[in-house]
UniProtKB/Swiss-Prot annotation:
Keyword Ubl conjugation on entry: yes
One GO MF term attached to the UniProt entry: beta-endorphin receptor activity
Phosphoserine PTM sites in chain numbering: 365, 377
Stated name of the protein: Mu-type opioid receptor
Role this protein plays: Receptor for endogenous opioids such as beta-endorphin and endomorphin. Receptor for natural and synthetic opioids including morphine, heroin, DAMGO, fentanyl, etorphine, buprenorphin and methadone. Also activated by enkephalin peptides, such as Met-enkephalin or Met-enkephalin-Arg-Phe, with higher affinity for Met-enkephalin-Arg-Phe.
Cellular compartments annotated: Cell membrane; Cell projection, Axon; Perikaryon; Cell projection, Dendrite
Membrane topology: Multi-pass membrane protein
Organism: Macaca fascicularis (Crab-eating macaque)
PTM annotation (Phosphotyrosine): residues: 168
Lipid attachment residues per UniProt (S-palmitoyl cysteine): 353
Length: 400
């Protein structure tokens, strides 16, 4: 997710389990995972502890809130990783597998699932980094993990903006929507969203590197001199372009849609189409709302930290990691939302998880028809096979 502003070494305590003194706090340019949003807050022993005097007592012993925080975050990251990977890959499979799912809206959902699947795949690396207090995976993986965080953040919010504009066109300009809202156009727009995200993702990939510090390795972003200026500039740009502007666009689109839905009884000539239109609009609105709820705390926290000095306390550290975890949690929530809010996704998920005899028959029938087209001479054999299957079903059918 947002790897843009947090220290790379999520735990700058050289080993809270074995040592009683904290290593120096990360430098302003050091970042890790979502914590990349703020260069000083990823130390579970408490940010900038050495600035307060470097006393041994400032690094909590085993069993203290820092260890509880570490265990809690590890458990949460594990759940998010498993649910996020399985759920998002299932969403992508369903959209690719079923022809009826290849709509413009679902093409955007595929893009969102791809970005979420990529970022959840980085959580095991970040968890190891957090627990060990060092980055053991090398420079290349460091660059990949940090850039994926940024790509996910920007691609996700750009895709949600696109979905909101798409819904606005479908609801408020249904005639124009016939030409604009096509799967082909949706795929082109998805590619454009990834290209736009590269404006941040690629520079971050080049800036990411590993540095040796006090016996440990940090996966960090390096800034040109003066580093404080470029670091804060990056935070402000992320806040504006990955949060403020997209939220304003989404708010305007849904404000206009709500006015339209209230003023018009029938959006189309069919009650069924009208019901589907409102249902899909509601689903997209919920997905957008959940995204904003999950990402608002970390964006606000980072921008406040960039502008004012926040006292270093255990509560601050716990709050910081909670904001990071909340941002990552969003990546596993979307598949759950689709399953509850969209009947088509719900049906396809059910068919995938619990194959029924009718689904198997339908798949076999599809394969048989395909084989018949490829080999016309086998048509008679296929007919006989179908007849035998029908007889077998009649024989094995339960008695009334």
């Amino acid at each position: 997710m947002d790897s843009s502003a947090v220290p790379t070494n999520a735990s700058n305590c050289t080993d809270a389990l074995a040592h009683s003194s904290c290593s120096p706090a990360p430098s302003p340019g050091s970042w890790v995972n979502l914590s990349h949003l703020d260069g000083n807050l990823s130390d579970p022993c408490g940010p900038n502890r050495t600035d307060l005097g470097g006393r041994d007592s400032l690094c909590p012993p085993t069993g203290s809130p820092s260890m509880i925080t570490a265990i809690t975050i590890m458990a949460l990251y594990s759940i998010v990783c498993v649910v996020g990977l399985f759920g998002n890959f299932l969403v992508m499979y369903v959209i690719v597998r079923y022809t009826k799912m290849k709509t413009a809206t679902n093409i955007y959902i595929f893009n969102l699932a791809l970005a979420d699947a990529l970022v959840t795949s980085t959580l095991p690396f970040q968890s190891v980094n957090y627990l060990m207090g060092t980055w053991p995976f090398g420079t290349i993986l460091c660059k990949i993990v940090i850039s994926i965080d940024y790509y996910n953040m920007f691609t996700s919010i750009f895709t949600l903006c696109t979905m909101s504009v798409d819904r606005y066109i479908a609801v408020c300009h249904p005639v124009k929507a016939l030409d604009f809202r096509t799967p082909r156009n949706a795929k082109i727009i998805n590619v454009c969203n990834w290209i736009l995200s590269s404006a941040i993702g690629l520079p971050v990939m080049f800036m990411a590197t590993t540095k040796y510090r006090q016996g440990s390795i940090d996966c960090t972003l390096t800034f040109s001199h003066p580093s404080w200026y470029w670091e804060n500039l990056l935070k402000i740009c992320v806040f504006i372009f990955a949060f403020i502007m997209p939220v304003l666009i989404i708010t305007v689109c849904y404000g206009l849609m709500i006015l339209r839905l209230k003023s018009v009884r029938m959006l189309s000539g069919s009650k069924e189409k009208d019901r589907n239109l409102r249902r899909i609009t509601r689903m997209v609105l919920v997905v957008v709302a959940v995204f904003i709820i999950c990402w608002t705390p970390i964006h606000i926290y980072v921008i406040i930290k960039a502008l004012v000095t926040i006292p270093e306390t255990t509560l601050q550290t716990v709050s910081w990691h909670f904001c990071i975890a909340l941002g990552y949690t969003n990546s596993c929530l979307n598949p759950v939302l689709y399953a509850f809010l969209d009947e088509n996704f719900k049906r396809c998920f059910r068919e995938f998880c619990i194959p029924t005899s009718s689904n198997i028959e339908q798949q076999n029938s599809t394969r048989i028809r395909q084989n018949t087209r490829d080999h016309p001479s086998t048509a008679n054999t296929v007919d006989r096979t179908n007849h035998q299957l029908e007889n077998l079903e009649a024989e094995t059918a339960p008695l009334p």
